[in-house]
Amino acid sequence: MTLDALQQRLGYRFSKPELLQQALTHRSHSAQHNERLEFLGDSVLNCAVADMLFGMFGKLDEGDLSRVRANLVKQQALYEIAQMLQLSDALRLGEGELKSGGFRRPSILADALEAIVGAVFLDAGFDAARALIRKLYIPILEQVDPRTLGKDAKTLLQEYLQGHKIALPQYNVIATHGAAHSQQFEVECIVPKLEVRVFGTGASRRAAEQAAAKLALDEVQKLVPQLLKRSRAERTGKTRKQPVPPDPQLSLRLKE
């Protein structure tokens, strides 16, 4: 992807395009890499996301706001935004990193996204960086449920199962499709105790696992109440008093 095409995706045009080029440069490519920009972008991102959360969720306290922000700026969340922007097509990697599939690595893509935020901050200041972050995050924030504090599907599924003392799910890659630079992964998620088996697809194993976990969570939340209801009914049946058989000796005495 050209720098011009990426700027169109970002909705921001750099006055100093070399900043964007540096933001896309991994340390394996050259000494003029993106790690300092990543450091800067991380701080700008945290501040801008905090500002948005403060305005959107007036009833959340400081602790809950911090937890929502942590889930929104963690590597997986940044990686998914980077995938949406197709940053893997614009990265500048060294030959070894390129051959090992570095353009698909979540850590590299997440770091590049933070570096882009840092580059925008240097290019035009905080307001421009905040506008970019808002553009990228508003679709995500509109789907955030304050009750779950922005946790991803795998975390929610794990916590739900643990809360009901059910063994954790199993994730298995069952297929990969497409060329190396545009692979699609297919993953199954199994919850043996509930006989749940669902499938998810994504541009990475993690993304496919998240998709499968979301489907599994929907199924599990339907099945667990039914399981609990049956369990309560069985316990009630076992504890209900059985009728006491008549005493034969007592019957004889009464007849006398």
UniProtKB/Swiss-Prot annotation:
Mg(2+) binds at E38, D111, E114. One of its GO terms (molecular function) is rRNA binding. It is an enzyme of class 3 (hydrolase). One of its GO terms (cellular component) is cytoplasm. Its EC number is 3.1.26.3. GO terms for biological process: mRNA processing; regulation of gene expression; rRNA processing; tRNA processing. It is found in: Cytoplasm. Residues 3-125 form the RNase III domain. CDD domains: DSRM_RNAse_III_family, RIBOc. The keyword rRNA processing applies. It holds the Pfam family dsrm. It catalyses: Endonucleolytic cleavage to 5'-phosphomonoester. Residues 152-222 form the DRBM domain. NCBIfam families: RNaseIII. Belongs to the ribonuclease III family. Digests double-stranded RNA. Involved in the processing of primary rRNA transcript to yield the immediate precursors to the large and small rRNAs (23S and 16S). Processes some mRNAs, and tRNAs when they are encoded in the rRNA operon. Processes pre-crRNA and tracrRNA of type II CRISPR loci if present in the organism. This is Ribonuclease 3.
